[in-house]
Amino acid sequence: MFLFFFCDLFWLRLLLCMYYCVSRLCFIVYFNCLMLIFDFLLFCLFDLYLFVGLCLFLLLWFMLFNLYSLILYYCITYLNLYLLFCIVFLLYIAFLFLFCFLCDFFLFNNLLVGDSFMDVFFIRFLLCFLECFSLLCRCLSTFLRLFCNLLSSHFLLLMFFDFFYFIFVFFFYGVFCYFILFIFVFCFCLLFYVFLYLLDLFAAILQLFIFCNMILQLIMDFLLFLLFV
């Protein structure tokens, strides 16, 4: 009985390792294909749609892994709970980024206002960044608590590998989010101040034209006065 149990456990572990390898490979292939497709088709909206597509893909990928481990181990482990927490975290960040941060671009892109709007814009950017950072810290702290509670579990080995894997994923996820936010903020500020500079330049040229026209009108009036006198 022990021999059959050991063989059965060995094959289950082997199947799970194979599924891990295939899922990682599919994730890398999908991510690269998604980058190429959106790079050629979406242009300026590439970062936004890639972010949402990546969150949806992680959602489906984690759900498939949850179902697979549920069939193998007949229970919901700490890893499943943590993955569900990651799903909620990623979707909430996507919602926060799309509907709270980019709302300023969609609502106020046609308004010509002063520096007070820029203050509101940077305050919104700062609040959104702090909210994302606090949620990331909560996610990592929850993962550490789950990891400490898992020290005596039979799932320790896979959880240990997933610890480094999710740290790696969240690191690049944070770099990716920072890159998107920095590009949007930099482009918006650059276009805004270039537009203000062009507007000031046009106003200066218009004032110069009005001044020259007034001078020419005075000269013409003076010449007509000399002619008739």
Swiss-Prot record:
Subunit structure comment from the entry: F-type ATPases have 2 components, CF(1) - the catalytic core - and CF(0) - the membrane proton channel. CF(1) has five subunits: alpha(3), beta(3), gamma(1), delta(1), epsilon(1). CF(0) has three main subunits: a, b and c.
Subcellular location: Mitochondrion inner membrane
Annotated Gene Ontology cellular component terms: mitochondrial inner membrane; proton-transporting ATP synthase complex
UniProt KW keywords: ATP synthesis, CF(0), Hydrogen ion transport, Ion transport, Membrane, Mitochondrion, Mitochondrion inner membrane, Transmembrane, Transmembrane helix, Transport
Record function comment: Mitochondrial membrane ATP synthase (F(1)F(0) ATP synthase or Complex V) produces ATP from ADP in the presence of a proton gradient across the membrane which is generated by electron transport complexes of the respiratory chain. F-type ATPases consist of two structural domains, F(1) - containing the extramembraneous catalytic core and F(0) - containing the membrane proton channel, linked together by a central stalk and a peripheral stalk. During catalysis, ATP synthesis in the catalytic domain of F(1) is coupled via a rotary mechanism of the central stalk subunits to proton translocation.
GO biological process: ATP biosynthetic process; proton transmembrane transport
Membrane-spanning segments: 24-44, 45-65, 83-103, 117-137, 143-163, 177-199, 206-228
Main localization of the protein described in the UniProt heading: mitochondrion
Superkingdom assignment: Eukaryota
Protein name, per record: ATP synthase subunit a
Topological relation to the membrane, as annotated: Multi-pass membrane protein
Family: Belongs to the ATPase A chain family.
